[in-house]
Structure formats: structure tokens, C-alpha cells
A protein has these predicted regions:
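Noncatalytic alpha-helical scaffold of FAD-dependent oxidoreductases
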Residues: 1-298
């Protein structure tokens, strides 16, 4: 129906003028966090599958430059909402408030070499070794937990004038491991600096154009290296299709219309709903025209 065509529908069914949300009741503005360093992708996936149900939030920071037996080594970052009893005496006096963190601003005109393969490899190694092999627990405020990059204002300037590309894909459970190994290996062989790599598990899909499906999603941030990078990403698109996965439209910048239709099998059902509700295609976007969702891009 219209609801499920709109959820995940990229704003193409119209303007949402009213939303009712069901919220989770919490006692504090803090998160009880566990950091756990893993040796490789197999250990990362095993812990996510065995222990995800114990946490409200779960994500893995992946060292995208690691290769060989260390491929996919990660830092698991998992958290639950803290109760008042979890807080220090000082925090417990005002459990729904916290001290705002100090921020730094990246200056303009950062040289492109600041984020190359060598600097990214060095940073990843230092960040990975910052954590111990056994789990470490901590209490942090929700702002630091959910928005870790916000300490660095204008962080996108680190990529220089070339900018950056975000690529996120999802794979079903039966193909996830092999698919993740292929993606990480192919990008590493292509000498592409993977500046930020995040791995999560997904539940069931809902909307007709929803990105999630049961399985694993991998999100990657990379410097925009022009044609060489785009060629690799187009190859990855075909790999994603063969593994039964799809690419996240909200972050997409280079998917083809043909690949999109293969990745989203419920597109025809969504399109019929769109035609019924908006026969003149009044609601469209650069993305929808490029992917020929609402017409052909000029």
C-alpha cells in the first residue's frame, strides 16, 4: 500500500506531512558500551551472530586495509541504554544531561595526500591496537556513541578537493561471508584507501524499495579517485547482484538503471503504486532520473 511504498521510497511518493513515532523509554542520556577487538572477519561475524541479541545497538568498525589472515579484523562497538544505577554519582544527579564535547574544525584546502593508502593504514593500525583483545566496558553519552565523527567539524574536507564516495551494500546470510571477503579483497587489491568501513547485521525488509534484508551490510567511505574507482564500483555492483544483494540508494552516486532493477525485485510493484498516486511524476530527483525510476535523466 501507499505506506510501504513511501517508507524507503526516496521521497518519490509525495511529502510526508505528519508522522507518529513509537519511542523507547530510557532513564539516562548515557550508553553502556562494550568494545571488543577481533582477529579477523570470521571472528567478527561469529560474535555478531552469537551476541547481537544482547544489545540494543551493535556495529563493527572494520580495518579496511588489513589483508591475509587479518582480513576483516574489527572493533565491535555494542551498547545498551544505561540505567541510573550504571552512572557515577556525579552523572546520576542529572542523568538526562551531559557535558558537550569539545570540537575541532578541519581547515579548508587539505591536500589530497592526507588520506592516502599509507596514512589510512597507519591510522587503522593505531585505532585497532588502541583496544584490547578482551572486551572493555565503558559509559559514554549518546552523542559520542551515535555521532562519533561530530567531534570533527567539516570532516569531509580531509578528502581534499576530490571529495569522497560512500558505497554501502547488503548481502543475504547464505552469501554474506564470501561476498564480504570478495569486496574487501578487491578494493584492497585495487589500492583504494578504505577510510571508514562499517559492518552491521540487518533484520527483515519492509518497504517496497527498502534497502535492508536479513544478512550483513558493509558501508565504505573512499576518496573519489575518478574513473579507476568508478570502474571498480561498477564491477562490485555486478558482484552484489550475483550474490543476491543490493546497494543503498540513499548513499548511491554511480549505480546504473539496469543494475538497480536487478537489485530491487519489488520495483515493479512500487512503480505501479507510484503511477497511481503520481501519474505526472511531479515528485522526482536526480537519483530517480539517473536510475530511470521516474524517467530518463537528461
Amino acid at each position: 500500500d501507499l505506506f510501504w511504498a513511501t517508507v524507503g521510497g526516496m521521497g518519490l511518493t509525495g511529502i510526508i506531512v505528519s508522522v507518529t513515532l513509537k519511542l523507547r523509554r530510557i532513564e539516562t542520556a548515557y550508553i553502556r558500551v562494550q568494545y571488543h577487538r577481533t582477529r579477523n572477519l570470521d571472528e567478527t561475524m561469529r560474535l555478531l551472530e552469537e551476541e547481537d541479541q544482547d544489545y540494543n545497538y551493535s556495529v563493527a568498525w572494520v580495518d579496511g586495509q588489513a589483508v591475509g589472515g587479518s582480513l576483516g579484523r574489527s572493533v565491535l562497538i555494542r551498547g545498551n541504554h544505561a540505567t541510573v544505577d550504571d552512572l557515577s554519582p556525579q552523572q546520576a544527579t542529572q542523568p538526562l544531561e551531559f557535558a558537550h564535547r569539545r570540537t575541532w574544525t578541519v581547515p579548508p584546502q587539505v591536500p589530497n595526500f592526507v588520506l592516502d593508502r599509507f596514512s589510512v593504514r597507519a591510522f587503522n593500525s593505531l585505532y585497532y591496537r588502541r583496544f584490547r583483545q578482551h572486551p572493555v566496558n565503558s559509559i559514554i553519552d549518546y552523542d559520542r556513541f551515535f555521532y562519533p565523527l561530530d567531534s570533527l567539524r567539516e570532516w569531509n574536507r580531509l578528502y581534499g578537493k576530490r571529495g569522497f564516495i560512500q558505497y554501502q551494500c547488503v548481502f543475504p546470510p547464505d552469501t554474506s561471508r564470501a561476498a564480504l571477503v570478495e569486496v574487501l579483497s578487491r578494493l584492497s587489491k585495487g589500492k583504494i584507501p578504505l577510510c571508514l568501513v562499517v559492518l552491521k547485521r540487518f533484520g527483515a525488509e519492509t518497504g517496497l524499495l527498502s534497502f535492508p534484508m536479513p544478512g550483513y551490510t558493509l558501508a565504505l567511505d573512499m576518496p573519489m579517485l575518478g574513473t579507476p574507482l568508478l570502474s571498480v564500483l561498477h564491477e562490485l555492483d555486478q558482484w552484489v547482484i550475483r550474490q543476491g544483494g543490493r546497494v543503498y540508494l540513499a548513499k548511491d552516486a554511480c549505480l546504473s538503471a539496469e543494475a538497480f532493477k536487478e537489485m530491487y525485485p519489488r520495483f515493479g510493484q512500487w512503480q505501479r503504486m507510484k503511477t497511481e498516486m503520481d501519474p505526472q511524476n511531479l515528485f522526482s530527483s536526480d537519483l530517480s532520473r539517473r536510475l530511470q525510476i521516474t524517467g530518463v535523466d537528461d
